[in-house]
């Protein structure tokens, strides 16, 4: 849904952005004014959040915990020094990812378009930032795309396969398992990617005692549908679970009464009081840990996505 990176805990993190479905947003006038039919693909577009989902998710991985008055709170992400490449693959109000069947689906299907843009820009030297911020290292994807009914995806749908392509290109992918609970209906597209790290959610029962932690009741259990390759191990998804229950969120503009990005509002005065649950919030926590692993490994070697997945 985009990110309101004006939030004090996210300020200064934006490096580049892209919006493949700009024409379907509440801020469409700003998108149109950005030029090129609202599909500005040079990384200069900064997608705002009209839903709260994107801002909450990036807070779990990257928030510094800074409040609007400059004080330090305890609500920081797992990698508070990480930066943001903001690619909005759904509408800013939460619909989608959007498939425009009135035009060529291959070109305009927003999730495919956005992920392909990430792959194409994995080594891009973004203007105006330090060389250490060039390229794209991690995709944190808190969204499902195709139905899990009838056993779900076997990992050969187009969305799972493009995430495999991202992993093979050198980008680590952390993707939500979904919130379909313990019923064994498999996993939807994206969460069924062969190579990506699929993330379930845990529930700590609101205690500090780790012995009572459980898989959250809503978290999809898997496995994904058998792809017929005679290797049952690659159907065992999700690979990991992380805290996703009753999570305190960085608040986007939309959480403030009357605030609208399209009307000039922003999240610069917001804090961290909203709460939410879902594998969406578990996933960016894992993404932040992956960022820390990459940072640590770079002191000695260049880690591959498969090494990190292990």
Predicted feature locations:
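Short, glycine/acidic-enriched loop or turn micro-motifs at the edges of active sites
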Residues: 2-3, 181, 307
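Active-site-adjacent helix-turn-beta-strand microarchitecture at beta-sheet edges
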Residues: 214
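Single conserved hydrophobic/aromatic residue that forms the stacking wall/gate
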Residues: 300-310
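Substrate-binding/access-modulating region of protease and related hydrolase catalytic domains
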Residues: 64, 68, 89-195, 201-206, ...
């Amino acid at each position: 849904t985009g990110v309101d990176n004006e939030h004090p805990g996210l300020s200064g993190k934006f490096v580049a952005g892209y919006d493949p479905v700009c024409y379907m947003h509440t801020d469409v006038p700003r998108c149109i004014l950005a030029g090129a039919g609202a599909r500005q693909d040079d990384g200069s577009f900064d997608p705002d959040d009209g839903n709260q989902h994107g801002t909450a998710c990036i807070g779990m991985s990257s928030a510094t915990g800074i409040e609007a008055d400059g004080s330090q709170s305890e609500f920081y992400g797992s990698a508070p020094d990480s930066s943001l490449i903001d690619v909005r693959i759904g509408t800013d109000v939460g619909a989608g990812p959007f498939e425009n069947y009135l035009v060529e689906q291959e070109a305009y299907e927003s999730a495919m378009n956005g992920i392909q843009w990430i792959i194409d820009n994995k080594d891009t030297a973004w203007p105006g930032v330090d060389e250490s911020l060039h390229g794209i290292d991690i995709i944190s994807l808190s969204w499902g795309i195709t139905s899990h009914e009838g056993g779900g995806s076997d990992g050969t749908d187009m969305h799972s396969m493009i995430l495999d392509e991202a992993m093979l290109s050198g980008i680590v992918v952390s993707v939500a398992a979904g919130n379909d609970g313990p019923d064994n209906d498999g996993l939807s597209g994206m969460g069924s990617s062969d190579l990506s790290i699929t993330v379930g959610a845990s529930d700590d029962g609101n205690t500090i005692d780790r012995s009572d932690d459980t898989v959250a009741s809503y978290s999809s259990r898997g496995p994904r549908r058998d792809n017929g390759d005679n290797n049952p191990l690659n159907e065992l998804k999700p690979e990991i679970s992380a805290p996703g229950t009753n999570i305190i969120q960085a608040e986007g503009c939309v959480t403030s009464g009357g605030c609208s990005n399209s009307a000039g509002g922003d999240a610069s005065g917001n804090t961290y009081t909203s709460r939410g649950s879902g594998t969406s919030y578990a996933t960016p926590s894992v993404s932040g840990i992956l960022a820390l692993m990459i940072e640590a490994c770079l002191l000695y070697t260049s880690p591959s996505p498969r090494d990190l997945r292990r």
